Amino acid sequence: MKKFSIVVAGGGSTFTPGIVLMLLENLDKFPIRQIKFYDNDAQRQEVIAKACDIIIKEKAPDINFVYTTDPETAFTDIDFVMAHIRVGKYAMREKDEKIPLRHGVLGQETCGPGGISYGMRSIGGVIELVDYMEKYSPNAWMLNYSNPAAIVAEATRRLRPNSKILNICDMPIGIEIRMAEMLGLKSRKDMVIRYFGLNHFGWWTDIRDKKGNDLMPALREKVAKIGYNVEIEGENTEASWNDTFTKARDVFAIDPTTMPNTYLKYYFFPDYVVEHSNPNHTRANEVMEGREKFVFGECRAIAEKGTAKDSKLHVDDHASYIVDLARAIAYDTKERMLLIVENDGAISNFDPTAMVEVPCIVGSNGPEKIVQGKIPQFQKGLMEQQVSVEKLTVEAWMEGSYQKLWQAITLSRTVPSASVAKAILDDLIEANKDFWPVLK
């Protein structure tokens, strides 16, 4: 059985140890001969890499492990790139969240002006990774779960249309794990779903068990009462996420024929979100004080002790979808998965060039979309507005256009007026001068 070589792009990420543990747990399904880390921040990556080196030696000593800041070393002789980069790190995420809040607009990592700001930083970084992969390992595939996935996917469609890149998001998976728990199922894989939308902007339209029984009525009853707020074993859910999962019941009420993605909260209830935000302490601060501190602390402890035996780092079970996706490509498994792909008729009454999130059958040639047919006017109207925000953002990046970025922010449902959009944009330009292209 062939053993694979992978590079994790974003080696210094707080998610990297959990992903490495998940890969090591799945070696029977997806054998690995080599794991490489690549990051452009050597110091940050080193802390994570030293710990992962020990973890790999203890759990799978035959795997060759390399960490580097050199693209040629990282991207030569690989089968898969697993990409989760955050250009500007959490310090810039904090600005993405706090700048809009100063103007009375919600501040969120991937939604509204904050998401647009993050997108403008991410495009260049992801395109650079695609180019390294194609230069040094032209037969490799990139599994990209870098945020904001919608803007990144549109950018790769426009700028690298023939590249072997699969854009995927774990949020629907996280919600499906909760749905399965609510329905008393062993796994989300016991459900067969139909879903359509854009990334962080979609709806489940049909959920059945493997025998074809409709699970939507039972789910509707529960979601109408508690949203998606259920206890998941081994998952430590922070207060801000509990609020999001509970608020899903209000999002659901707007169209009870479907099940919503939780991110719709930011578009339907922006006033509520602003009211419940602390402009001086946002989600970025929560992450820096919580997960970032914990992961880096644990990694330093592993390096000091020389063993990971008592480590509290845990497997990122969520991330097992990455193995499912890699296996689908490697072994032609025809796995059914939600991916972000060019619409091209999957949603018959929607822009064929839009990057939509729909179920696909994935094999060694990539994804084949499952047609979702016509979508209702309500969702279509919302999606046309949102996809225009994403397309204008990518055009603004490509053309260095201030005008188009102002239009993109103005068009976001989260922003009340063009004058507020302009004020936010001017502040974001100042904050991002080391990261964005120059806008004229």
UniProtKB/Swiss-Prot annotation:
MF-aspect GO terms: hydrolase activity, hydrolyzing O-glycosyl compounds; metal ion binding; oxidoreductase activity, acting on the CH-OH group of donors, NAD or NADP as acceptor
SUPFAM superfamilies in the cross-refs: LDH C-terminal domain-like, NAD(P)-binding Rossmann-fold domains
InterPro entries registered for this protein in UniProt: GlycHydrolase_4_CS, Glyco_hydro_4, Glyco_hydro_4_C, Lactate_DH/Glyco_Ohase_4_C, NAD(P)-bd_dom_sf
EC number: 3.2.1.-
Residues bound to substrate: 93, 147, 283
Activity dependence on pH, as recorded: Optimum pH is 6.9-7.3.
Site feature location: Increases basicity of active site Tyr: 109
Record key words, sorted: Carbohydrate metabolism, Glycosidase, Hydrolase, Manganese, Metal-binding, NAD
Pathway: Glycan degradation; palatinose degradation
GO biological process, one term: carbohydrate metabolic process
Amino acids binding NAD(+): 4-70
Cofactor: NAD(+); Mn(2+)
Residue ranges the record marks as coiled coil: none
Enzyme class: hydrolase
Cofactor note: Binds 1 NAD(+) per subunit.
Active-site annotation: 170, 263
Annotated binding of Mn(2+), by residue: 169, 200
Induction: Induced by growth on the sucrose isomers trehalulose, turanose, maltulose and palatinose.
Similarity comment: Belongs to the glycosyl hydrolase 4 family.
Reported function: In vitro, readily hydrolyzes p-nitrophenyl-alpha-D-glucopyranoside 6-phosphate (pNPalphaG6P), a chromogenic analog of the phosphorylated isomers of sucrose. In vivo, is probably involved in the degradation of the 6-phosphate derivatives of the sucrose isomers trehalulose, turanose, maltulose and palatinose, catalyzing their hydrolysis into glucose 6-phosphate (G6P) and fructose, which allows the bacterium to use these sugars as energy sources for growth. Is not able to hydrolyze the C2 or C4 chromogenic stereomers (i.e.
Subunit-structure text: Homodimer.
Protein name listed in UniProt: 6-phospho-alpha-glucosidase
